[in-house]
Amino acid sequence: MPLTYLKKQYRARQTRWTPTGDQFAFADSVDFLNHEHWDLASAGSGPLFGRAYLACLEAHKPAQLSFKYALVYRQGQPVACLVMQVLDSDLSVFLPRNSPLAHGGRLLSTRIFICGSLLCWGNRGVAVRQGIKPETVWPSVAEAIYRVRRSARLSGETDFVLVRDLPSAHPDSAILEDYSYSTVDVEADMVLNLRDWKSYDDYLGSLQSKYRKAAKDVLKNISKAGCVVEELADFESYEQRLFELYRLVLERIF
């Protein structure tokens, strides 16, 4: 057993320090990369790898978040693309706001490098071109992440690296274990079954009692304050204000 383990570790070390032979293009914005090549690499991977979506995300990102992108080339042809994020924050984001430790956490800065997205679930970090075997690309993914991290040292050290979210049954990504990555279990995606609700009371009736009581208490407090809850019919007139409130919630998360 010890000999088998040592052989495995030696092989993994050799893999980590051996270039893949693929070529790379890196950028701080998706618009800086070759548009045609990005579209070829991301075709079939869904709209969240689309340039229009990513450009919109860049324009309206949280203040502490920055983006990195990479195209992987093999023999001059694009075979994969990567979407990466860098979060510069402090340790208070991992604590409840009313925690006595939150203030101390603000004094400790942290940098998290993510291949994927903190703003949604699923694999939003790696798209492999159709017709390319994914298992041949993951070593290049690890090399691309390493290169971007090395260049990012000019603005600070990275404390943690995430590649998210990959299902446990994803065999190809297991190759990343040879590059010192390990698996971390995360919570399952939330699935909300929409019921045949016709009114707000129908919605409240479907909640657990403690949540239903909390919602009713909020309505009672609004009524006591002399306020009136009305249906928003003219949505377009309040569209900007609603978006500002949404942004406020998003900024508080980070």
Segments the model singles out, each with a brief description of its role:
Residues 1-254:
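N-acyltransferase acceptor-side catalytic subdomain
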